[in-house]
């Protein structure tokens, strides 16, 4: 019994260390991308808005809709019941 408890504790410790290291890596990557972004805010916002307008309503690769059609009672579920 004590061996399995130690094994569980070791696994939990490894999971915590892995999540901590991945979190710090993601923060580092986010910091690098924000430093590389252009300083012109309006130009970058205009560049982002163009691809958003060209999106289709449904992506055939995923069963979840991009825009919820509100076919069920939960208006923000994101899953279309009609597909």
UniProtKB/Swiss-Prot annotation:
Induction remark: Regulated in response to changes in circulating iron concentrations, iron stores or the development of inflammation and iron-restricted erythropoiesis. Down-regulated following anemia induced by hemorrhage or hemolysis: down-regulation is mediated by ERFE. The induction of upon inflammation is mediated by IL6.
Pfam families, A to Z: Hepcidin (PF06446)
Principal cellular location given in the protein's record: secreted
GO CC terms of this entry: extracellular region; extracellular space; nucleus
Keyword Electron transport: no
InterPro entries from the UniProt entry: Hepcidin
Disulfide bridges in this chain: 65-81, 68-71, 69-77, 72-80
Residues that make up the propeptide removed upon maturation: 24-53
Compartmental location: Secreted
Superkingdom of the organism of origin: Eukaryota
GO terms, molecular function: copper ion binding; hormone activity
Keywords linked to the UniProt accession: Cleavage on pair of basic residues, Disulfide bond, Hormone, Secreted, Signal
N-terminal signal peptide: 1-23
Single Gene Ontology BP annotation: cell surface receptor signaling pathway via JAK-STAT
UniProt note on tissues of expression: Highly expressed in the liver and to a much lesser extent in the heart. Secreted in blood.
Function in brief: Liver-produced hormone that constitutes the main circulating regulator of iron absorption and distribution across tissues. Acts by promoting endocytosis and degradation of SLC40A1, leading to the retention of iron in iron-exporting cells and decreased flow of iron into plasma. Controls the major flows of iron into plasma: absorption of dietary iron in the intestine, recycling of iron by macrophages, which phagocytose old erythrocytes and other cells, and mobilization of stored iron from hepatocytes.
PANTHER family listed in its UniProt record: HEPCIDIN
Family of this protein: Belongs to the hepcidin family.
Self-association state and partner proteins as the record states: Interacts with SLC40A1; this interaction promotes SLC40A1 rapid ubiquitination.
Listed name of the protein: Hepcidin
Lineage: Eukaryota, Metazoa, Chordata, Craniata, Vertebrata
Gene name of the encoded protein: Hamp
